[in-house]
Design a protein with these regions (language model features):
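Regulatory and interdomain segments flanking nucleotide-handling catalytic cores
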Residues: 1-262
Length: 262
């Protein structure tokens, strides 16, 4: 007996028509399918696409998401990665305003497409600037000759997004996505855990979620002044307390008070 999660992983790694179809290739296939559905659609955001869906779908044929954290582009002396969690603000309230199942379904689909679109804005930037990135990162080739991207999505669904990337560009990548979401009408908050590649992933993810929640607390405090986007980050290393509050109490507090915005 195996769980359905294990079954899906095994299916994703099996040969298909003599060609290995790993999970990262399926991720790219999903993105390409969404890009095809976006092609020719009217765009209602405050700014037009910064990319052409058909061209990006074609360009992605030459690239692959790394399946190992060590292949995100880190150098030996800078072996840090980042776990990024981004979440839309007040989405529950927005869905409650949809008083029929049809409206909720349409809104859910619209939010999903906007989330994918924002991620594709970043991918287009990365591909367009790939030669420059290679000067600062160690970006390898996959066995099939495709070039590894310095990022890998973990969750892309609804207003929720989690990805891993090289630490050097974590803030820039997150800013690009949050600005794209904002242009698409979704203000959001984000949390970034910066950690050694060998650091336990689940701990980094938990802290990234807590950082996003801390950013949302600031957003809610400023709510009367209108919508806003907030980002919080932390650098993790060695043995540290299990919660963000404990980490900051231990490392970012002094006799004169705290040394962070929280």
């Amino acid at each position: 007996f195996i769980s359905w999660e294990v079954k899906r992983k095994l299916l994703a790694a099996r040969k298909k028509d003599g060609i290995i179809a790993p999970a990262e290739e399926e991720l790219l296939d999903k993105l390409r399918s969404v890009l095809k559905s976006l092609a020719g659609e009217p765009f209602t955001a405050s700014v037009p696409y910064t990319f052409v869906p058909e061209k990006l779908a074609e360009a992605l044929q030459k690239y692959a998401f790394p399946s190992e954290f060590e292949k995100l582009g880190q150098r030996e002396t800078e072996d840090y990665m980042a776990i990024v969690h981004i979440d839309g603000n007040n989405m529950g309230e927005k869905f409650r305003d949809s008083d029929t199942l049809t409206k909720r379904k349409n809104m859910s689909l619209a939010v999903y497409k906007k989330t994918i679109t924002a991620f594709c804005v970043l991918l287009d930037d990365i591909i367009g600037d790939y030669a420059s990135l290679q000067k600062h990162l160690v970006l390898e080739e996959a066995d099939d000759g495709k070039l590894f991207l310095p990022i890998r999505p973990i969750v892309l669904g609804g207003d929720d997004m989690t990805f891993v990337c090289t630490a050097k560009y974590a803030l820039a990548f997150t800013r690009t996505i949050m600005e794209a979401l904002n242009d698409l009408g979704i203000d959001s908050c984000g949390g970034i855990s910066i950690l050694p590649t060998a650091y336990p992933f689940f701990r980094g993810y938990e802290i990234a979620e807590q950082l996003c929640s801390a950013a949302k607390s600031k957003m809610r405090a400023m709510r009367e002044e209108g919508t806003s986007c907030w980002l919080d980050f932390a650098i993790l290393h060695g043995e540290q307390p299990p919660t963000l509050d404990q980490i900051r109490a231990q490392q970012y507090s002094g006799k004169c008070g705290t040394m962070h915005f929280g």
